[in-house]
């Protein structure tokens, strides 16, 4: 089975967290699900560099990476995903969607109301147990 390693940004602005909705996908089980933004590392990149690049490419935002949060290993039907999540901050919540179909800035206690991609659920649950 194919393995994919990615990074994800938990972007916080004024005590709200950015949640993005994926578009249509060849894999039904992640199509139109919410997720934390991020992507795959390029050769020679650190995880922090990858997050900054991906967020700039996908959202036209600049972020500060504060600290590593949790790593999730999730087996989907077609691949195994290892996702390293990081707490990030931004100074400006304005973004431009280039790959996603919706964005929401939510308080921690509102996160569970979204239909999350399965690999992102452990991150969402851990966030709900934290104080921001």
Residue ranges and their predicted role:
Residues 11-12, 19, 88-90, 105:
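Conserved hydrophobic "DFG−1" position in protein kinase catalytic cores
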Residues 58-65:
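Short secondary-structure junctions
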